[in-house]
């Protein structure tokens, strides 16, 4: 019995399902979750001291790699002055200024402590600003676990086989309209049905919670135009894509300007940070300057701000984004070539520093229905073969993978050697 087995048994006695976030329980792949004791660079070590090349990266934040010296130094230095004050600090201004510089559509930004807080608050703000109730989201996209967003939710809810979460009142859900990702016609129909009632569209610019599904040509631009036409607020959820698809986010990569942007993951450098921001005229509707309420005891926590500032300062150095994309492409194309070699139906989507693996004979995966048609049983076998070989992938067929700047060409080669064996087992 491994140490992870023992720990999981203990955890299940005091933590629901033995984990503090459902996907970690390995329900999507079977078996016992791997308990991690330490991490450095591109690697994690389990409690039996086995090393893995890590493509989860704490689900996205670790874009520089684990335990990066610049972030660690900033956290230690800041912690020496105190852990939390519940008052304004200079460093939260520093981070806000840098975020607004890197993502120009964000004229003002409010810091929170999670991506869920960011999306929840942005939607409340959009509703208050427009004085409308209904929102549009997309099937298979996930924006955190706020009640109004767990309607045909993706990611963990897909893995659990519960596309509609119990506990969400029907009166909440009725205000959420769910359209088809990459299908502008479905969005047009929603606006035509409720032309005066829709407060906002919220969308992942790259759907990263039904694995990795990029937008098709003009999809995001089409959403922008529909929001302009009907007076709705256009919210781009960059919790996953922010600073990872491009330094200016996916909105920069795809050349589209939202009214509001939600951030998380990378902005905290591994600490719990979220943010939402956008046009000044909308952001001034938030308290204390406006009537829409939002608050948080740990919002702008100085240690989290220090980690985020150090992360983004390092990330903006010349060549980093190009290197991240280069590594991701090498991995993606290498995996596809190996799948073809072993005659395993397989497609890879990738953009910037994120990628998605699909066991399917479809040449393209562009929406929720395409994802749901993939062979999850093959993914389970592949996942465990890779785990045995020391490669840690997301333990779900519905989650994206993440590259970091700490990964090397040698790490990619090691991963592809493992994948050769894994695909051979599936042939």
From Swiss-Prot:
Q: Which Gene Ontology BP annotations are present?
A: protoporphyrinogen IX biosynthetic process
Q: Which cofactor does it need?
A: pyridoxal 5'-phosphate
Q: What is its main location?
A: cytoplasm
Q: Which UniProt keywords apply?
A: Cytoplasm, Isomerase, Porphyrin biosynthesis, Pyridoxal phosphate
InterPro entries given in the database record: 4pyrrol_synth_GluAld_NH2Trfase, Aminotrans_3, Aminotrans_3_PPA_site, PyrdxlP-dep_Trfase, PyrdxlP-dep_Trfase_major, PyrdxlP-dep_Trfase_small
Residues in a coiled coil are none
Cell compartment(s), UniProt: Cytoplasm
**Residues where N6-(pyridoxal phosphate)lysine occurs?**
265
* Signal is among the record's keywords: no
Q: Which domain of life is it from?
A: Bacteria
- Give the E.C. number(s): 5.4.3.8
Stored Pfam families = Aminotran_3
Q: Please provide one cellular component term from the Gene Ontology annotations of this protein.
A: cytoplasm
Q: In which pathway does it act?
A: Porphyrin-containing compound metabolism; protoporphyrin-IX biosynthesis; 5-aminolevulinate from L-glutamyl-tRNA(Glu): step 2/2
SUPFAM superfamilies to which the protein is assigned, alphabetical: PLP-dependent transferases
Description of how the protein assembles with itself and partners: Homodimer.
Q: Which family does it belong to?
A: Belongs to the class-III pyridoxal-phosphate-dependent aminotransferase family. HemL subfamily.
Protein name (record): Glutamate-1-semialdehyde 2,1-aminomutase
**Organism (species):** Mannheimia succiniciproducens (strain KCTC 0769BP / MBEL55E)
What lineage, starting at the top, does this entry show?
A: Bacteria, Pseudomonadati, Pseudomonadota, Gammaproteobacteria, Pasteurellales
| Gene name for this UniProt entry | hemL
